[in-house]
A protein has these predicted regions:
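N-terminal Rossmann-like NAD(P)+-binding subdomain of aldehyde/semialdehyde dehydrogenases
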Residues: 1-28, 199
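Short loop/edge segments at beta-strand edges and connector loops
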Residues: 11, 96, 234-236
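Short, conserved active-site loop motifs that form the nucleotide-linked donor/cofactor pocket
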Residues: 92, 268-269
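Structural alpha-helical scaffold elements that stabilize or flank donor/cofactor-binding regions
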Residues: 30, 104-106, 223-226, 264
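Active-site loop ensemble at the mouth of alpha/beta enzyme cores that anchors a bound cofactor
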Residues: 259
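Conserved glycine-rich beta-strand-loop-beta hairpin in the small C-terminal domain of fold type I
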Residues: 242-246, 262-268
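ALDH superfamily catalytic-core signature
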Residues: 87, 120-255, 273-277
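Rossmann-like NAD(P) dinucleotide-binding subdomain of oxidoreductase/dehydrogenase enzymes
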Residues: 20-156, 198, 274
Length: 277
């Protein structure tokens, strides 16, 4: 509804000033559809991160091919069913599959590619798109820090950090990846975060049906391998049979530790300290 209500205003021609050499001319910009677009969606929030760009693409007058992630096959099947029931296939088409299908789609010449996912795959998408000078929107991950100084409201900070970190068991591109905390409030903040974790998931998170799973065995092994037992101050236990890892805090981490060399994308919060900003 929002797109439909505003797209006419968004696409209205807009007058633009001209430079001195073209002072007698009149300039304007005109918004037009890109054309045939490709949306490559991730597995962590498959409906939101597929349907949101789809709504924008359709409102702007484009046709769309959707490629859901093979890591979420059940969601992919539901998205395909919804689109087949709601849209003419000439307007919206869903292509399911894995790496082979991704490669085949990237061999095509698109008018626009919208990709959400990891940095390595994002680099590949941009490289392949560059061969046809296809414009690309990349929504990638990163190591998002939380910085807490001595003036912060620690209860609010703890609640927000815990929610952002362990929502979807850390499998969120904007989840806090590591915590930079003033040494003066370090102990109090960690105590409050631990309280929030217990409030959210109870004393036994691995038995909590509302506490999520790591997406697959490959990612489970990678995330578990980042846990340094000597630095665990909360959690640290993993259950391979259910692909669950406890909400885990690693304290006393240094920038050279293995866990600081890549995006965690799991339920591990690493803690570093500072004396002053």
């Amino acid at each position: 509804r929002h797109q439909i209500a505003h797209v006419a205003r968004w696409s209205r021609p807009r007058l633009r000033p001209c430079d001195l050499a073209n002072a007698v001319s009149a300039g304007k910009t005109q918004a037009v559809p890109y054309g045939v677009t490709l949306i490559m969606a991730p597995w962590n929030y498959p409906f939101l991160l597929t349907l949101e760009p789809l709504a924008g693409a359709l409102a702007a007058g484009n046709t769309v091919v959707i490629k859901p992630s093979a890591y979420a096959p059940a969601s992919s099947a539901v998205l395909k069913q919804i689109c087949e029931e709601a849209f003419d296939p000439r307007l919206v088409t869903v292509v399911e599959g894995g790496r082979a299908e991704n490669e085949a789609l990237l061999d095509e010449c698109w008018d626009k590619i919208f990709f959400t996912g990891s940095v390595p795959v994002g680099k590949l998408v941009m490289e392949r798109a560059s061969k046809n000078l296809t414009p690309v929107t990349l929504e990638l991950g990163g190591k998002s820090p939380c910085i807490v100084d001595a003036t912060a409201n620690l209860k609010v900070a703890a609640r927000r950090i815990a929610f952002g970190k362990w929502l979807n068991v850390g499998q969120t591109c904007v989840a806090p990846d590591y915590l930079l905390v003033d040494t003066r409030v370090h102990d109090e903040l960690l105590g409050l975060i631990k309280e929030e974790v217990r409030r959210m998931f109870g004393e036994h998170p691995l038995d909590n049906e509302d506490y999520g799973h790591i997406v697959n065995a490959k990612h489970f092994a990678r995330v578990r391998g980042l846990i340094d037992p000597d630095k665990v101050v909360l959690g640290g236990t993993a259950r391979e049979s259910s692909l669950k890892i406890e909400p885990t805090i690693l304290d006393g981490v240094t920038p050279d530790d293995a866990v600081m060399q890549e995006e965690i994308y799991g339920p591990i919060l690493t803690v570093l300290t500072f004396e002053s900003l």
